[in-house]
């Protein structure tokens, strides 16, 4: 056992002794309901009205300092923290003894008068205190700077207690999602829920998680996207729908990827990718202004400006700018392979021009996209669910939004031709048979739905986690997910 573990063990022993002493005194250390009428920050903001009045507040003790027959403590709640003042002559010996047994981390209910100390600090003169939860494990003294940052993610409950800025991130995350809902609800969109377990995973290019339903004796997949179900609803006449929910992809973990993540997906009948582009710009800029109060934010040393209109560039033009390749002159698969080789890329056997365009874009362009930028005109080979462009049918009416080198949104004019869709599914199935585990499966029921007739529609997915990262200045996706997926510790492996 390490020295720190020994110290914690000894401290826990002392706290358990205090717990026993409280019970001997007839005090319940794990209290019940407590009616509070004030929060720390509200007391400070309304001090002129509350001075001298008795209030009830509850929260966690974050510090304590005693001087003989008087002492102070800091109490924290969701809104902030406030100083408590304890005096034996006011509380009496028995209740002052309760104060003396306080440990940092204990949760109390407090009744007392609001006043300002001689040093000018707004405080509460405690008249009564109630134990609501005795803390048996001491809080860490130096949590924020831990070298093992994963410990903060593993014990998020402690992270939230000792780091107010972490709490603020998740409060802001909640507000971002609320504002997105409000924006869409106000514009006539209907929030819906679609299956999390699906017999056929679809709607994205990704490796799924597989589970088994015992009663039905069948394999099911945690969804990689809700897209195909949402478009079934468009077929059914629900013309404007959205869903905010989890997706699951059995892939790697990084600062930008977590196996389960939150997406907003939106579909609008009689729209297209340009309608989605405008909606994306309007929605995100409106939420940015509501939540942050400004269209400009600093992120990793860059000042990002969300003021519309955002830059729009075709994928081919973006490649031409970044890599000097003009794919309007490179027409064949062979010439595209040669161009990719010259750039130092490893080219898979049988790679098509469209696949190589996408690969070159990912390798040479994405890292240069800092300010909000719509990249549109993706090859049909990498867009199996998007409508072909009328003028250049080898490309699609699709866009991706990039900010700070990250894909934030993906949208397109939805393919509603069941014959074309089935042909593309067949090509995806061939890729899957060739070893591409991320290629789409055939979904006959979805084809059947399209055969009833789906109106032209625009559809879009926005990555909530990555958007929250930007709006909160968080460098890792694990900073904006309360309980991210983590590698097992050696003792758990």
UniProtKB/Swiss-Prot annotation:
InterPro entries: Aa-tRNA-synt_II (IPR004364), aa-tRNA-synth_II (IPR006195), aa-tRNA-synth_II/BPL/LPL (IPR045864), Lys-tRNA-ligase_II (IPR002313), Lys-tRNA-ligase_II_bac/euk (IPR034762), Lys-tRNA-ligase_II_N (IPR044136), Lys-tRNA-synth_II_C (IPR018149), NA-bd_OB-fold (IPR012340). Its EC number is 6.1.1.6. The keyword Membrane does not apply. GO terms for biological process: lysyl-tRNA aminoacylation. GO terms for molecular function: ATP binding; catalytic activity, acting on a protein; lysine-tRNA ligase activity; magnesium ion binding; transferase activity; tRNA binding. Its main location: cytoplasm. Homodimer. Belongs to the class-II aminoacyl-tRNA synthetase family. This is Lysine--tRNA ligase. It comes from Syntrophomonas wolfei subsp. wolfei (strain DSM 2245B / Goettingen). The lineage of its organism: Bacteria, Bacillati, Bacillota, Clostridia, Eubacteriales.
């Amino acid at each position: 056992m390490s020295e720190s573990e020994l110290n914690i063990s000894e401290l826990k022993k002392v706290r358990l002794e205090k717990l026993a002493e409280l019970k001997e005194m007839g005090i319940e250390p794990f209290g019940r309901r407590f009616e509070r009428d004030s929060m720390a920050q509200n007391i400070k903001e309304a001090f002129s009205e509350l001075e001298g009045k008795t209030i009830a507040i509850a929260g966690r003790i974050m510090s304590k300092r005693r001087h003989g027959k008087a002492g102070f403590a800091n109490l924290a709640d969701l809104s902030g923290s406030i100083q408590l003042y304890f005096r034996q002559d006011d509380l009496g010996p028995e209740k002052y003894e309760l104060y003396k047994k306080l440990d940092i981390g204990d949760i109390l209910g407090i009744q007392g008068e609001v006043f300002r100390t001689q040093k000018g600090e707004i405080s509460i003169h405690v008249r009564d205190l109630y134990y609501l939860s005795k803390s048996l494990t001491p809080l860490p003294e130096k949590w924020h700077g831990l070298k093992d940052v994963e410990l903060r993610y593993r014990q998020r409950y402690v992270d939230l207690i000792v780091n107010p800025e972490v709490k603020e991130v998740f409060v802001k995350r909640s507000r971002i999602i609320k504002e997105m809902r409000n924006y869409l609800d106000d514009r006539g969109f209907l929030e819906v829920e679609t299956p999390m377990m699906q017999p056929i995973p679809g709607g994205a290019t990704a490796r799924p998680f597989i589970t088994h339903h015992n009663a039905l004796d069948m394999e099911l997949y945690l969804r990689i996207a809700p897209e195909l179900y949402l478009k079934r609803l468009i077929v059914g006449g629900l013309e404007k729908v959205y869903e905010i929910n989890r997706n699951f992809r059995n892939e790697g973990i990084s600062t930008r990827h977590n196996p389960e993540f939150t997406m907003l997906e939106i579909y609008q009948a009689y729209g297209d990718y340009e309608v989605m582009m405008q909606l994306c710009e309007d929605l995100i800029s409106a939420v940015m202004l509501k939540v942050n109060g400004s269209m400009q934010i600093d992120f990793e040393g860059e000042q990002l400006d969300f003021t519309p209109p955002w830059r729009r560039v075709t994928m081919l033009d973006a490649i031409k700018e970044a890599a000097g390749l003009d794919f309007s002159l490179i027409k064949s698969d062979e010439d595209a392979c040669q161009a990719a080789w010259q750039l130092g890329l490893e080219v898979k056997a049988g790679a098509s021009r469209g696949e190589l365009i996408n690969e070159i874009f990912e390798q040479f362009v994405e890292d240069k996209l800092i300010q909000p930028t719509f990249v549109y005109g993706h090859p049909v080979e990498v867009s199996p669910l998007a409508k072909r462009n009328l003028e250049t049918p080898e490309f699609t009416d699709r866009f991706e939004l990039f900010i700070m080198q990250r894909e934030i949104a993906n949208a397109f004019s939805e393919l509603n031709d069941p014959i074309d869709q089935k042909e593309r599914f067949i090509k995806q199935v061939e890729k899957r048979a060739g070893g591409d585990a991320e290629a789409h499966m055939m979904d006959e029921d979805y084809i059947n739905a399209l055969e009833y007739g789906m109106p032209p529609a625009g559809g879009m997915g926005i990555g909530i986690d990555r958007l929250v990262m930007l709006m909160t200045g968080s460098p890792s996706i694990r900073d904006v997910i309360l309980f991210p997926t983590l590698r097992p510790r050696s003792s758990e492996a």
